[in-house]
Amino acid sequence: MYHAYVELKAEDGSLAEVIPYDIGFRRIEIIDKIIYLNGKRLIITGVNRHEWNAKTGRCIGIEDMKADISCLLRNNINSVRTCHYPDQIPWYYMCDNAGIYVMAETNLESHGSFQKLGAIEPSCNVPGSFPQWKGAVIDRAKNNFETFKNHTSILFWSLGNESYAGDNIEAMNVYFAEKQDGRLVHYESAYYNRAYEDTISDLETRM
């Protein structure tokens, strides 16, 4: 990481504000079905991570995050997926500084809406292709992107988890693609609806 300073000056040239920010440089490519990071093949050894503490439940603190980073590094884990929602903001700074790659997941999970007694039955799948859900879905994607777009550790955007597939999730994919920020986009439930497997996410080929 590199330390950058943005200076804001008044009309008379006097210094009004200084904003420090740690930045990094990265280039992600897929060449012959292999992911490269800054020109070198990327081998991912990653885990899903929930924000959880055995005593405080879903309310975790900075020390919990530091312990998780330490655990990842001790076990040679180089990447983490923020399942199944965006994490607290400090977590992304910690991943930046520790060199942990991040799949930043959008806050979307609705697996109960397309399963009936364990079977796949998507007649009431939400958000699916219902037009009344599109705005809310895109808003969640936008919130994820705009909040965390400047974090070098983020290599992937995730559209969510276990929410079947449909026009609305496809629209999320288009939203991230139009940003052209060089990151890859992933979604793990496209296989439930093969009509969208080529327009949402590629799960099965070996990149």
Predicted regions and their residues:
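Substrate-binding/catalytic cleft of secreted carbohydrate-active enzymes
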Residues: 70, 79-207
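Secreted/periplasmic carbohydrate-active enzymes, especially glycoside hydrolases
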Residues: 1-94, 98-102, 140, 155-156, ...
